[in-house]
């Protein structure tokens, strides 16, 4: 499928613009200025539309290619500010530090954690272990899932220091708090950021 068909600008321009925005802590206007300095005149609103569209495409293609993770997962939630209000980002990574999935929600509770863990099970099956912090909602959600037959052989570990890796990975996402304008656009942007990070990590291994 040609994801660039019918676009006014060439594929290379779109890829560079989206890459600048997702990889660096830049605003859409700052990306516009960088492109203008290179002789490319494109409006910041067009760059915004590209980021929203191609972040989702990148994320979909990455997840389609990477669907197996059997050993262990690390999972937690963190705070993301969107238009002055706090939201909660659930995120899971595999044993190699690659993102399995993310989910941005308005509430942080057992129901949200339950739905995210169920979604992970549907996509990736059952790992040997899931490492989380000691948030009550995560433990409660895991026990509820086991009571209905999911994760029967998975060990749930709540050792705080095993989760330091995923906590550190939240920093680039949080640095962009001032740019998030809605739950939908923040979710798309974060998916794009996570995908580029995963691709870069894979190439460096």
Task: Tell me what each language-model feature is.
Residues 69-81:
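Two-metal-ion RNase H-like nuclease active-site motif
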Residues 102-124:
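Active-site beta-loop-alpha junctions of metal-dependent nucleic acid enzymes
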Residues 202-205:
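Conserved small/polar residues in nucleotide/adenosyl-binding loops
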Residues 1-22, 43, 68:
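Basic, short loop/linker segments at the boundary and entry of helix-turn-helix/winged-helix-like folds
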Residues 28-39:
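DNA-recognition alpha helix
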Residues 49-67:
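Short, basic alpha-helical nucleic acid-contact segments in DNA-binding proteins
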Residues 17, 31, 47, 76, ...:
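Mobile genetic element proteins and their domesticated derivatives, centered on retroelements
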Residues 134-191, 195-198:
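Helix-centered, glycine/charged polyanion-binding patches within enzymatic domains
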